[in-house]
Swiss-Prot record:
Other comments on record: B.subtilis contains five chromosomal type I signal peptidases: SipS, SipT, SipU, SipV and SipW. They have different, but overlapping, substrate specificities and have different transcription patterns.
Protein name per the record: Signal peptidase I T
Source organism of the structure: Bacillus subtilis (strain 168)
Parts of the chain that traverse the membrane: 26-42
Primary location class: membrane
Keywords: Cell membrane, Hydrolase, Membrane, Protease, Transmembrane, Transmembrane helix
Alphabetized PROSITE patterns for the sequence: SPASE_I_1 (PS00501), SPASE_I_2 (PS00760), SPASE_I_3 (PS00761)
């Protein structure tokens, strides 16, 4: 009887050990999977400042799609997250000009390669600027965007450091990814456009 009791105790101990090992494996796999997803696919980012107002607000959190760096391509109008050159600061801006294009603003109208380009995401800001009797963007250019670089601007053109005035043209390897979704605050979840 004692021998049988010892065998049962050993079996129970082995089951517990196996259970702990299985849980340990599951936790390690989950952590590795989360790290891989965050590094290569999606990552949350915090919006700091008002340069993208009214599209994005200070304190909102975005999910950034990093797959555009591996598959797909950046498109004009995409909201992009940019690594700072010398610090851990990230910038959130709208992609305006792509490599090889010529960018110009005249009378608050965007021209790419001499052709007018609509910017529907600016309609609210344009109305506010008109009420104040000021130009939303100000004239500039033409600026030729070289190979491997991008021209970006904030939607809050009167209050944005961007390719016009401080950030300069953005190297492709500084673009982390594109924003597609605001997930916080929860009551303001939405797609970004």
């Amino acid at each position: 009887m004692t021998e049988e009791k010892n065998t049962n105790t050993e079996k129970t101990a082995k089951k517990k050990t196996n259970t702990y090992l299985e849980w340990g494996k599951a936790i390690v796999i989950a952590v590795l999977l989360a790290l891989l997803i965050r590094h290569f696919l999606f990552e949350p980012y915090l919006v700091e400042g008002s340069s993208m107002y009214p599209t994005l607000h200070d304190g909102e959190r975005l999910f950034v799609n990093k797959t555009v760096n591996y598959i797909g391509e950046l498109k004009r109008g995409d909201i992009v997250i940019i690594n700072g050159e010398t610090s851990k600061i990230h910038y959130v801006k709208r992609l305006i000009g792509k490599p090889g294009e010529t960018v110009q603003m005249k009378d608050d109208t965007l021209y790419i390669n001499g052709k007018k380009v609509a910017e529907p995401y600016l309609s609210k800001n344009k109305k506010e600027a008109e009420k104040l009797g000021v130009s939303l963007t100000g004239d500039f250019g033409p600026v030729k965007v070289p190979k491997g670089k991008y021209f970006v601007m904030g939607d809050n053109r009167l209050n944005s450091m961007d390719s016009r005035n401080g950030l300069g043209l953005i190297a492709e390897d500084r673009i982390v990814g594109t924003s597609k979704f605001v997930f916080f605050p929860f009551n303001e979840m939405r797609q970004t456009k």
